[in-house]
Amino acid sequence: MTNIRKTHPLMKILNDAFIDLPTPSNISSWWNFGSLLGLCLIMQILTGLFLAMHYTPDTSTAFSSVAHICRDVNYGWFIRYLHANGASMFFICLYAHIGRGLYYGSYMFQETWNIGVLLLLTVMATAFVGYVLPWGQMSFWGATVITNLLSAIPYIGTTLVEWIWGGFSVDKATLTRFFAFHFILPFIITALAAVHLLFLHETGSNNPTGIPSNMDMIPFHPYYTIKDILGALLLILTLLALTLFTPDLLGDPDNYTPANPLSTPAHIKPEWYFLFAYAILRSIPNKLGGVLALLLSILILIFIPMLQTSKQRSMMFRPFSQLLFWTLIADLLTLTWIGGQPVEHPYIIVGQLASILYFLLILVLMPTAGLIENKLLKW
């Protein structure tokens, strides 16, 4: 009798995806982040569900309902901070996962990569609308500033902004619809993640060398299930340490002040995981230009497979490209730092230079390095 996991229609799908999946024998810990993202998504949906049971999406009660969750609900403070810091862990894993894809040339699986970019945009949208829900000062002003960027679109901009707001300012209608979006988007993310996996399993995983590994595969279970469990334990340990010792480390103190349309905070800034894009937006002294640069800073990922000039897929054996890759990481960290600073000298010029370098590295320097390395192969 054949094992039920290989014959049952549902079990067969799970078996082919997580048990008998042929996997390269040499994939490193950088390949752990996919499963960690799945874990983050499950945790966010569960903690979010329990928060939604006590939260009220209404301008008059939203802030106090969050306070009620933290004070009166059993372990409500714990669920709330797990959810808030879980978002940070989600983005850490997301950026590591994308970085791995860039370094090892995983973007050559184009369908998988493009759905990944779509996933990134959806997660960013979810995090943005979620940040508005506690209805603190930074929630309100963040929503006002970011939605207002759409008014830079010629002709239809203003109408579009008012349509999204549901009125002439960020108000009750905006909060209600943002709650609806924040509830539905994670399920859309789950569906997209399933398609992401579907396309990945059409080709099989890439590996650190970037060389096809068809002749050297091992079953996913037990080798990588145990490795994923170790990664999951480390993720949970980090999340618990963050939540229980410094729950407000990554948050903004302004969000503990209820939203007030009559008082603007001194420095409006998004959560840390959006600061690099915010810095690029601010570095261009023109509204439409800034919005386009902001969009392009993320959408540039779609063009990366087209910018591949090297004959080698991975950067493992390409020292020049490695140097440029780590320069890009340093540049993104610089942009993240600048995004959190006030708009004054010297931060303005540093932000502008870092923004120029960001696009220069991806569009010019890295493809050029690939061509130079191709020449070196002939020596």
UniProtKB/Swiss-Prot annotation:
This is Cytochrome b. The cytochrome bc1 complex contains 11 subunits: 3 respiratory subunits (MT-CYB, CYC1 and UQCRFS1), 2 core proteins (UQCRC1 and UQCRC2) and 6 low-molecular weight proteins (UQCRH/QCR6, UQCRB/QCR7, UQCRQ/QCR8, UQCR10/QCR9, UQCR11/QCR10 and a cleavage product of UQCRFS1). This cytochrome bc1 complex then forms a dimer. Keywords: Electron transport, Heme, Iron, Membrane, Metal-binding, Mitochondrion, Mitochondrion inner membrane, Respiratory chain, Transmembrane, Transmembrane helix, Transport, Ubiquinone. Its cofactor is heme b. Its main location: mitochondrion. Coiled coil: none annotated. It is found in: Mitochondrion inner membrane. The lineage of its organism: Eukaryota, Metazoa, Chordata, Craniata, Vertebrata. A ubiquinone binds at residue 201.
